[in-house]
Amino acid sequence: MDIVSLAWASLMVVFTFSLSLVVWGRSGL
């Protein structure tokens, strides 16, 4: 695994986590 794919994987994880966090925050859970 090279650094580019690793960076993309970490970016997708952070984006998905922050997006789900915003959705949970707006849902009031």
Swiss-Prot record:
Membrane spanning residue stretches: 3-23
Compartments where located: Plastid, Chloroplast thylakoid membrane
GO molecular function term, any single one: electron transporter, transferring electrons within cytochrome b6/f complex of photosystem II activity
Signal peptide residues on this chain, from the entry's feature table: none
Highest taxon, organism lineage: Eukaryota
Gene Ontology cellular component annotations, sorted alphabetically: chloroplast thylakoid membrane; cytochrome b6f complex
InterPro entries per record: Cytochr_b6-f_cplx_su8_sf, Cytochrome_b6-f_cplx_su8
Any one of the GO BP annotations: cytochrome complex assembly
Bilayer topology term: Single-pass membrane protein
Keywords of the record: Chloroplast, Electron transport, Membrane, Photosynthesis, Plastid, Thylakoid, Transmembrane, Transmembrane helix, Transport
UniProt record similarity statement: Belongs to the PetN family.
Described purpose of this protein according to its UniProt entry: Component of the cytochrome b6-f complex, which mediates electron transfer between photosystem II (PSII) and photosystem I (PSI), cyclic electron flow around PSI, and state transitions.
Subunit structure: The 4 large subunits of the cytochrome b6-f complex are cytochrome b6, subunit IV (17 kDa polypeptide, PetD), cytochrome f and the Rieske protein, while the 4 small subunits are PetG, PetL, PetM and PetN. The complex functions as a dimer.
Protein name, as recorded: Cytochrome b6-f complex subunit 8
